[in-house]
Regions:
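Thiamine diphosphate
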Residues: 1-145
Length: 145
C-alpha cells in the first residue's frame, strides 16, 4: 500500500509516455503528499484513485479468512479539492461509463491530474473468494493457501 503514486519516477524517466498511477484511497493517502513533487516538477501524471472509504482489499482478504470486519473504514477528504490544493487538477467519475472518457481527458490535459472513481469491492469477495477459488485451488482450498 502506498506504492502507486511513486509512479512519479516513470513520468520522470519517460516524459513522452502516458503514465497512470492506480491507487486505492487508503494507499493513496499514505503517499499523497508526493503530488506536490509531481506538480513542482511539472510532470505529466494521471492518478486514478479507486475510492471505497475503506481498506477494501484488506477487508476482502479478512472476510475470505473468516475474520470480523473491524477498523477498516475511514473518511476521505474531498479528493478533487485535495488535488487542487497542490496545484493539480481533479475530477470525479460517478459511474463506469464515465471512466474511459475521464481518463482520456486527464491524459489529454497534461500536468498532474487526479481522477476519483467509486468502487464496490463486494463483488470481488463473491468472485475471488468463491468462484475463482473453486476453479484454481481445488476443493476445500483457498487460492492463496
Amino acid at each position: 500500500m502506498g506504492a502507486g503514486l511513486p509512479a512519479i519516477a516513470a513520468a520522470l524517466i519517460h516524459p513522452a509516455r502516458r503514465v497512470l498511477a492506480v491507487c486505492g484511497d487508503g494507499g493513496f493517502m499514505m503517499s499523497s503528499q508526493e503530488m506536490e513533487t509531481a506538480v513542482r516538477l511539472k510532470l505529466n501524471l494521471v492518478v486514478l484513485v479507486v475510492e471505497d472509504n475503506a481498506y477494501g482489499m484488506i477487508r476482502w482478504k479478512q472476510q475470505a479468512d473468516g475474520f470480523t470486519d473491524w477498523g477498516l473504514t475511514f473518511g476521505n477528504p474531498d479528493f478533487v479539492a485535495y488535488a487542487a490544493s497542490y496545484g493539480a487538477r481533479g475530477s470525479r467519475v460517478t459511474g463506469a461509463d464515465g471512466l474511459a472518457p475521464a481518463l482520456e481527458a486527464a491524459f489529454n490535459a497534461g500536468g498532474v491530474q487526479l481522477v476519483v472513481v467509486p468502487i464496490d469491492y463486494s463483488e470481488n469477495i463473491r468472485v475471488l473468494s468463491g468462484e475463482l477459488s473453486k476453479l484454481t485451488a481445488g476443493p476445500g482450498r483457498k487460492a492463496w493457501d
